[in-house]
Amino acid sequence: EELVELVEAYTKAVGLFRTPEAEEKVQYSEYLELDLSTVEPSLAGPKRPQDRVPLKEVKKSFLAHLTKPVKERGFGLSEDQLQRKVLVKRRDEEFELTHGSVVIAAITSCTNTSNPSVMLGAGLLAKKAVEAGLDRKPWVKTSLAPGSKVVTDYLEMSGLMPFLEALGFHLVGYGCTTCIGNSGPLPEPVHDAITAGKLVA
Protein backbone atom coordinates (compact mmCIF):
# COMPACT_ATOMS: atom_id res chain seq x y z
CA GLU A 1 0.00 0.00 0.00
CA GLU A 2 2.88 2.32 0.79
CA LEU A 3 4.38 1.63 -2.65
CA VAL A 4 1.05 2.39 -4.35
CA GLU A 5 0.86 5.72 -2.54
CA LEU A 6 4.43 6.52 -3.56
CA VAL A 7 3.72 5.72 -7.22
CA GLU A 8 0.54 7.81 -7.13
CA ALA A 9 2.36 10.77 -5.56
CA TYR A 10 5.19 10.54 -8.09
CA THR A 11 2.95 10.24 -11.17
CA LYS A 12 0.85 13.18 -9.99
CA ALA A 13 3.97 15.28 -9.38
CA VAL A 14 5.32 14.67 -12.90
CA GLY A 15 1.94 14.96 -14.63
CA LEU A 16 1.58 11.30 -15.60
CA PHE A 17 -1.32 10.36 -13.33
CA ARG A 18 -4.46 9.72 -15.36
CA THR A 19 -8.11 9.26 -14.47
CA PRO A 20 -11.09 9.20 -16.87
CA GLU A 21 -12.04 12.70 -15.68
CA ALA A 22 -8.54 14.07 -16.15
CA GLU A 23 -8.25 12.46 -19.59
CA GLU A 24 -11.10 14.62 -20.89
CA LYS A 25 -9.10 17.76 -20.06
CA VAL A 26 -5.87 16.60 -21.68
CA GLN A 27 -4.84 18.56 -24.75
CA TYR A 28 -2.32 17.08 -27.16
CA SER A 29 -0.12 19.19 -29.41
CA GLU A 30 -0.31 16.59 -32.16
CA TYR A 31 -2.43 13.57 -33.09
CA LEU A 32 -1.06 10.69 -35.11
CA GLU A 33 -3.26 8.17 -36.87
CA LEU A 34 -1.99 4.83 -38.10
CA ASP A 35 -3.76 2.34 -40.31
CA LEU A 36 -2.77 -0.95 -38.67
CA SER A 37 -3.40 -2.81 -41.93
CA THR A 38 -0.27 -1.11 -43.31
CA VAL A 39 1.97 -2.57 -40.59
CA GLU A 40 3.90 -5.62 -41.75
CA PRO A 41 6.59 -7.83 -40.23
CA SER A 42 10.13 -6.90 -41.12
CA LEU A 43 13.75 -7.86 -40.51
CA ALA A 44 16.87 -5.76 -40.13
CA GLY A 45 19.94 -6.10 -42.28
CA PRO A 46 21.65 -7.87 -43.81
CA LYS A 47 24.52 -5.66 -42.61
CA ARG A 48 23.09 -2.77 -40.58
CA PRO A 49 20.30 -2.88 -37.99
CA GLN A 50 18.73 0.29 -39.41
CA ASP A 51 18.18 -1.33 -42.83
CA ARG A 52 14.59 -2.53 -42.54
CA VAL A 53 13.44 -5.18 -45.03
CA PRO A 54 9.78 -6.30 -45.21
CA LEU A 55 9.58 -10.03 -44.47
CA LYS A 56 8.07 -10.81 -47.87
CA GLU A 57 11.13 -9.25 -49.57
CA VAL A 58 13.89 -10.82 -47.43
CA LYS A 59 14.91 -13.53 -49.89
CA LYS A 60 15.01 -11.15 -52.84
CA SER A 61 16.89 -8.51 -50.84
CA PHE A 62 19.45 -10.99 -49.50
CA LEU A 63 20.18 -12.44 -52.94
CA ALA A 64 20.59 -8.93 -54.36
CA HIS A 65 23.03 -7.96 -51.57
CA LEU A 66 25.22 -10.99 -52.24
CA THR A 67 26.43 -9.54 -55.54
CA LYS A 68 26.22 -5.83 -54.69
CA PRO A 69 29.59 -4.11 -54.22
CA VAL A 70 30.81 -3.87 -50.63
CA LYS A 71 30.72 -0.05 -50.80
CA GLU A 72 26.97 -0.34 -51.48
CA ARG A 73 26.49 -2.50 -48.36
CA GLY A 74 26.71 -5.70 -50.39
CA PHE A 75 29.02 -8.69 -50.12
CA GLY A 76 30.69 -8.33 -53.53
CA LEU A 77 30.38 -11.96 -54.62
CA SER A 78 30.78 -13.02 -58.24
CA GLU A 79 28.13 -15.13 -59.99
CA ASP A 80 30.41 -18.18 -59.66
CA GLN A 81 30.72 -17.68 -55.91
CA LEU A 82 26.94 -17.67 -55.46
CA GLN A 83 26.68 -21.44 -55.97
CA ARG A 84 29.25 -22.27 -53.30
CA LYS A 85 28.31 -25.11 -50.91
CA VAL A 86 30.33 -26.65 -48.10
CA LEU A 87 29.89 -30.14 -46.65
CA VAL A 88 30.05 -30.23 -42.86
CA LYS A 89 30.49 -33.27 -40.62
CA ARG A 90 29.44 -32.85 -37.02
CA ARG A 91 28.70 -35.62 -34.52
CA ASP A 92 27.66 -38.46 -36.88
CA GLU A 93 25.79 -36.06 -39.17
CA GLU A 94 26.62 -34.56 -42.55
CA PHE A 95 24.98 -31.49 -43.97
CA GLU A 96 25.58 -28.71 -46.48
CA LEU A 97 25.90 -25.04 -45.72
CA THR A 98 25.36 -22.38 -48.37
CA HIS A 99 25.11 -18.61 -48.51
CA GLY A 100 22.21 -17.60 -46.31
CA SER A 101 22.31 -20.64 -44.04
CA VAL A 102 20.98 -19.62 -40.63
CA VAL A 103 23.48 -20.74 -38.01
CA ILE A 104 22.26 -18.84 -34.91
CA ALA A 105 18.73 -18.62 -33.49
CA ALA A 106 18.34 -16.74 -30.23
CA ILE A 107 15.51 -15.43 -28.10
CA THR A 108 17.25 -12.54 -26.38
CA SER A 109 16.66 -9.69 -23.96
CA CYS A 110 15.23 -7.14 -26.35
CA THR A 111 11.81 -5.57 -25.91
CA ASN A 112 10.05 -8.73 -27.05
CA THR A 113 11.17 -10.79 -24.05
CA SER A 114 9.33 -8.31 -21.81
CA ASN A 115 6.11 -8.97 -23.70
CA PRO A 116 4.36 -12.00 -22.15
CA SER A 117 2.03 -12.52 -25.11
CA VAL A 118 4.99 -12.79 -27.50
CA MET A 119 7.01 -15.04 -25.20
CA LEU A 120 4.07 -17.32 -24.46
CA GLY A 121 3.43 -17.36 -28.21
CA ALA A 122 7.01 -18.56 -28.71
CA GLY A 123 6.46 -21.26 -26.11
CA LEU A 124 3.21 -22.39 -27.74
CA LEU A 125 4.90 -22.45 -31.14
CA ALA A 126 7.69 -24.59 -29.67
CA LYS A 127 5.08 -26.92 -28.15
CA LYS A 128 3.33 -27.35 -31.51
CA ALA A 129 6.67 -27.93 -33.25
CA VAL A 130 7.75 -30.60 -30.77
CA GLU A 131 4.35 -32.31 -30.91
CA ALA A 132 4.59 -32.36 -34.72
CA GLY A 133 8.02 -34.01 -34.50
CA LEU A 134 9.92 -30.97 -35.76
CA ASP A 135 13.39 -30.02 -34.61
CA ARG A 136 15.98 -27.37 -35.37
CA LYS A 137 18.64 -28.04 -37.97
CA PRO A 138 21.79 -29.59 -36.47
CA TRP A 139 24.00 -26.64 -37.46
CA VAL A 140 21.86 -23.99 -35.72
CA LYS A 141 23.15 -22.72 -32.37
CA THR A 142 20.19 -21.84 -30.14
CA SER A 143 19.85 -19.95 -26.87
CA LEU A 144 17.35 -18.22 -24.60
CA ALA A 145 18.45 -15.07 -22.75
CA PRO A 146 15.46 -13.03 -21.57
CA GLY A 147 15.88 -9.72 -19.81
CA SER A 148 14.15 -10.84 -16.64
CA LYS A 149 13.70 -13.89 -14.42
CA VAL A 150 9.97 -13.21 -14.60
CA VAL A 151 10.03 -14.62 -18.15
CA THR A 152 11.44 -17.98 -17.12
CA ASP A 153 9.05 -18.05 -14.15
CA TYR A 154 5.95 -17.79 -16.31
CA LEU A 155 7.34 -20.09 -19.01
CA GLU A 156 7.96 -22.73 -16.33
CA MET A 157 4.60 -22.16 -14.61
CA SER A 158 2.77 -22.46 -17.94
CA GLY A 159 4.59 -25.72 -18.71
CA LEU A 160 6.10 -24.32 -21.93
CA MET A 161 9.78 -24.20 -20.94
CA PRO A 162 10.41 -27.92 -21.66
CA PHE A 163 9.25 -27.44 -25.26
CA LEU A 164 11.64 -24.53 -25.82
CA GLU A 165 14.43 -26.60 -24.30
CA ALA A 166 13.54 -29.57 -26.51
CA LEU A 167 14.29 -27.32 -29.49
CA GLY A 168 17.59 -26.22 -27.95
CA PHE A 169 16.43 -22.91 -26.47
CA HIS A 170 18.03 -23.43 -23.06
CA LEU A 171 18.50 -20.56 -20.65
CA VAL A 172 22.01 -19.13 -21.00
CA GLY A 173 21.54 -16.12 -18.72
CA TYR A 174 19.64 -12.87 -18.40
CA GLY A 175 20.57 -9.81 -20.40
CA CYS A 176 22.26 -8.89 -23.64
CA THR A 177 23.85 -11.78 -25.50
CA THR A 178 23.61 -12.64 -29.18
CA CYS A 179 22.26 -9.30 -30.41
CA ILE A 180 25.42 -7.50 -29.30
CA GLY A 181 27.78 -10.22 -30.47
CA ASN A 182 27.89 -12.22 -27.24
CA SER A 183 26.71 -15.49 -28.74
CA GLY A 184 29.89 -17.37 -27.95
CA PRO A 185 31.64 -19.40 -30.64
CA LEU A 186 29.84 -21.48 -33.23
CA PRO A 187 30.53 -25.22 -33.16
CA GLU A 188 34.01 -25.63 -34.62
CA PRO A 189 33.00 -27.65 -37.72
CA VAL A 190 30.35 -25.03 -38.60
CA HIS A 191 32.73 -22.12 -38.03
CA ASP A 192 35.48 -23.78 -40.06
CA ALA A 193 33.13 -24.57 -42.94
CA ILE A 194 31.84 -21.00 -43.14
CA THR A 195 35.37 -19.61 -43.01
CA ALA A 196 36.87 -22.06 -45.50
CA GLY A 197 33.95 -21.71 -47.89
CA LYS A 198 33.81 -17.91 -47.49
CA LEU A 199 30.08 -18.21 -46.96
CA VAL A 200 27.71 -15.39 -46.10
CA ALA A 201 25.81 -17.14 -43.32
Locate predicted features.
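Fe-S-dependent hydro-lyases/dehydratases of central metabolism
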Residues: 1-201
